[in-house]
Amino acid sequence: QKLCERPSGTWSGVCGNNNACKNQCINLEKARHGSCNYVFPAHK
């Protein structure tokens, strides 16, 4: 399981196989991808 601990930070839960993290990053943070570290793509 991967934690969504990225600097953009509206999600503090666990990135599972569901779309919760993806949707929140895309919908609320205007991310291009579902990855929650879209602000710093090289920082994981």
From Swiss-Prot:
PROSITE patterns: GAMMA_THIONIN
SMART domains: Knot1 (SM00505)
UniProt record, GO biological process: defense response to fungus; killing of cells of another organism
Keywords in alphabetical order: Antimicrobial, Disulfide bond, Fungicide, Plant defense, Pyrrolidone carboxylic acid, Secreted
Gene3D superfamilies: Knottin, scorpion toxin-like
Disulfide bonds: 15-36
Modified residues (Pyrrolidone carboxylic acid): 1
Subcellular localization, as worded in the UniProt entry: Secreted
Recorded GO CC terms: extracellular region
Pfam families noted in UniProt: Gamma-thionin
Role noted for this protein: Possesses antifungal activity sensitive to inorganic cations.
Entry similarity comment: Belongs to the DEFL family.
Protein name: Defensin-like protein 1
Organism of origin: Brassica napus
